[in-house]
Amino acid sequence: MGTILIADDDKTCRDSIQKVLEREGHKVRAAASVDGAIEALGTDHFDLVVCDYRMPGKTGIDLLIELRRLNSAVPVLMISAFADALVEAAVKRLGALDVLKKPIRRQELVARTAKVVGG
């Protein structure tokens, strides 16, 4: 099982994702902002980051840019209620593995996570 970081300003969504992933046996840490995620990434190792695209202040795009600046190879799954083809293309160009559309289906989250970290 993997160690996963969730970055989402929506507490309900963040808690829901955390609960699903913990039930699958993953160790999960959550952050309510991009800055919180960057701080967590500086102190711990993660096998995967699940990050919301649109958050107040810095966005998921900002997180991807910061990860690349730090030469981090941690895989990122972006989540968004606003994802369209342009958003998907932009985040993939910056290194995200894929975009999961909100509301996230449990089965899809489990399957995408398992592809990256096993489970």
Report residues per predicted region.
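Two-component/phosphorelay signaling modules centered on CheY-like receiver
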Residues: 11-29, 94
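The feature encodes the CheY-like receiver
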Residues: 14, 56, 84
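Acidic, metal-coordinating helix/loop segments flanking the phosphotransfer/catalytic sites
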Residues: 30-48, 69
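Acidic catalytic/metal-coordinating carboxylates
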Residues: 33, 59-62, 95
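Short amphipathic alpha-helix used as the core "switch/output" element in two-component signaling
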Residues: 39, 61-73
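Active-site T/S-Asp motif of two-component receiver
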Residues: 51-52
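C-terminal output helix
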Residues: 86, 104-113
